[in-house]
Amino acid sequence: MIGLVGRKVGMTRVFTEDGVSIPVTVIEIEANRVTQVKTLENDGYTAVQVTTGSKKASRVTKPEAGHFVKAGVEAGRGLWEFRTEGEEFTLGQEINVDIFADVKKVDVTGTSKGKGFQGGVKRWNFRTQDATHGNSLSHRVLGSIGQNQTPGRVFKGKKMAGHLGAERVTVQSLEVVRVDAERKLLLVKGAVPGATNSDVIVKPAVKA
């Protein structure tokens, strides 16, 4: 089963019949329109390419416009691809949120919020050094970053200060709380990566 592209609306909570509060993220999943079907013969693998939402005509490049016209669909805000295994799709077909009606858990992929250049304490959860006891300058610095003449260098991958966030993140096995096909909404338990209104990819959970 393929996934769908949606938009993170925000977080709220829903109550069970027992009065238990469940924190949920609301994901709006408008119809995903098929723009290309990739086959083993033509492309070397099988996949389906989709778009969703809309884009101003002035923002659509000529190659994009031709691609959308060929598929017979309205220009969307992007193109996404999902590998397929045996599923049949046709150009222009619309795939809706109700495909998750019988799914218990999903994996959600998004781009995490960018936080700019951050130090080791925020970025890697390093401990801070002593507030006093002779320490007047090095409260939040890394400390030692290696040895001496051997190896005489800092190992690659050493955790240091640097750019935090704004990277692709997947949160796995989030419970599906509600599928509202009429309003095109999917409610999942817990938080998903990204800012409000950012695009997210929702797939049936790999580890479910």
UniProtKB/Swiss-Prot annotation:
Q: What is this protein called?
A: Large ribosomal subunit protein uL3
Tell me the name of the encoding gene.
Answer: rplC
**One cellular component (GO) term of this entry:** cytosolic large ribosomal subunit
Q: How is it modified after translation?
A: Methylated by PrmB.
Q: Tell me the keywords, alphabetical order.
A: Methylation, Ribonucleoprotein, Ribosomal protein, RNA-binding, rRNA-binding
Q: What is the lineage of its organism?
A: Bacteria, Pseudomonadati, Pseudomonadota, Gammaproteobacteria, Pasteurellales
Q: How does it assemble?
A: Part of the 50S ribosomal subunit. Forms a cluster with proteins L14 and L19.
Its BP terms in the Gene Ontology are:
translation
Gene3D superfamilies recorded: 3.30.160.810, Translation factors
**Species the sequence originates in:** Actinobacillus succinogenes (strain ATCC 55618 / DSM 22257 / CCUG 43843 / 130Z)
Q: Which InterPro entries match?
A: Ribosomal_uL3, Ribosomal_uL3_bac/org-type, Ribosomal_uL3_CS, Transl_B-barrel_sf
Q: Name one Pfam family in it.
A: Ribosomal_L3
